[in-house]
Amino acid sequence: MTVIYPSPIFGPVHSRRLGVSLGINLLPEDGKVCTFDCIYCECGFNSDHRPKKPLPTREEVRAALEARLQDMQKNGPVPDVLTFAGNGEPTAHPHFPEIIEDTLALRDKYFPKAKVSVLSNSTFIHRPAVFEALNKVDNNILKLDTADEAYIRKLDRPAGHYSVRGIIGGMKAFKGNCIIQTMFLKGGFGDKDMDNTSDKYVLPWLEAVKEISPRQVMIYTIDRETPDHDLQKATHEELDRIAALVREAGM
């Protein structure tokens, strides 16, 4: 089954990439709010989970986070990271920049060694306040599943006006202070072949990554239930080949 996360705080969970991660969900607890509608999303399709409840307020997020950090300070476990993730796109919250300020202050107070991470699909990085907030966190993790304009509309299915080239330009503005995260998979969606592990997709993506020049690249494949059941994991060999190309490019 796909999953909808509690709000505004969930976990901690053990993350493959980040360690002991306390989740911060700025979206409603009863549904999904996202500018993407990815066919592999562990939260399901947007249409499956239309929320009826409001977004948590800045004050609710701050109070819930402080209470959880106090409990973890007393009873454990020690978090490696505080991660903005959950039921959709965290930067869509109207008070995302202020919530980042609150989170950094609480992190410094209770667990100064913990990192603050944001998992974002990059659709709001053109907003100056969002850009500045992402520049302040330890791990600014930005999604770039492809450099192909047609393929992204089959895989990530962005809402409204969306330009891959525009997003790549926005990512370049971070001047290396970002981590690129990319999903590689195979299988189909309806009558569409969704395999993005071939050079047709990998090489243009690699050129885009070189342009962005991030400090790190995360490549991964499906690990949890997906709303479309015809999707398949990329193999270890395929991921290793792509990783080798990234390393050869100096990242």
Provide a role label for each language-model segment:
Residues 44-81, 95-98:
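Conserved alpha-helical substructure of the radical SAM core
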Residues 58, 100, 202, 235, ...:
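Amphipathic alpha-helical segments in well-structured domains
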Residues 92-232:
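Conserved AdoMet/S-adenosylmethionine-binding subsite of the radical SAM
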